């Protein structure tokens, strides 16, 4: 598969404290990569640099072009973002919040098109949000808000979707729905990069990227024995890895 997004020699700091140290990563078209690591490893920082939301040294390449050379509209249509906090405009209806995802495709003189409205309607239906369409975002629970904000990110229809802890406040049934959505996206060619704390969910990805102390330690497939050894070292736990129904799981020993 061709590489669509690259991080090359990324260095970044927060309040003059280094958070990324010579980070390198490649993300292939149509693959889901999950970033894991202990607290403070630099996971969210790397994701923000990939999205162009955090200044850094080094290069981020999107379709082989430097991210910094792209216009804000180009970045907004090519990279969809779902942050860790379920933030949004509380007074807006669910329909209008999801429609915000179409803004990068609109111009001030045309506004929302029939195509934009069709995209939003299809997302509301597929994500079982239709009955909430007129409810304001502020009336929803944290997990419900996160589902709506995921729909907003999907409305961008970007080739790359970046998500930071997207299911932290979502119950188990909707976690399964989220996983099915991610798998459907990758099957249609979308590149998905997510940060997750749940290691067994992370092992459902095509690639797992392990971080520690601001560095990318390893990027490998869930079946790779080198990844299993790396995860035990980084998390400082003895783990046993088993394949269950074509998926890998990690158990504490």
Report the location of each language-model feature.
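Helix-to-loop junction immediately C-terminal to a conserved catalytic motif
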Residues: 51
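Conserved ABC transporter NBD signature motif
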Residues: 58-66, 75
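Conserved ABC ATPase "signature" region
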Residues: 99, 114-132
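Conserved ABC ATPase signature
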Residues: 136-140, 144
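Catalytic Walker B motif of ABC-type/P-loop ATPase nucleotide-binding domains
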Residues: 161-165
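H-loop (His-switch) and adjacent beta-strand-loop-beta switch element
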Residues: 205-222
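ABC ATPase nucleotide-binding domains
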Residues: 232-253
């Amino acid at each position: 598969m061709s590489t669509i997004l690259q991080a090359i020699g990324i260095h970044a700091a927060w309040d003059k404290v280094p958070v990324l140290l010579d980070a390198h990563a490649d993300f292939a078209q149509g693959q889901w990569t999950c970033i894991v690591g202990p607290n403070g490893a630099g996971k969210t920082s790397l994701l923000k640099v990939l999205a162009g939301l955090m200044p850094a040294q080094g290069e981020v390449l999107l379709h082989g072009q430097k991210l910094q050379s792209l216009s804000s509209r180009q970045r907004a249509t090519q990279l969809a973002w779902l942050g860790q906090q379920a933030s949004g405009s509380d007074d807006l209806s669910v329909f209008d919040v999801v429609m915000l995802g179409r803004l990068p495709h609109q111009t001030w003189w045309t506004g929302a098109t029939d195509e934009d409205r069709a995209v939003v309607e299809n997302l509301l239906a597929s994500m079982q949000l239709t009955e909430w369409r007129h409810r304001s975002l502020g009336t929803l629970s944290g997990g419900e808000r996160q589902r709506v904000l995921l729909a907003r990110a999907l409305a961008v229809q970007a080739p790359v979707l970046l998500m930071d802890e997207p299911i932290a406040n979502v119950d188990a049934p909707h976690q399964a729905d989220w996983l099915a959505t991610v798998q459907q996206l990758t099957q249609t060619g979308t590149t998905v990069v997510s940060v997750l704390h749940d290691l067994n969910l992370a092992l459902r990805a095509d690639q797992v990227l392990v971080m520690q102390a601001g560095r990318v330690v390893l990027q490998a497939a869930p079946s790779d024995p080198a990844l299993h050894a790396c995860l035990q070292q980084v998390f400082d736990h003895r783990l046993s890895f088993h394949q269950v129904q074509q998926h890998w799981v990690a158990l504490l020993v």
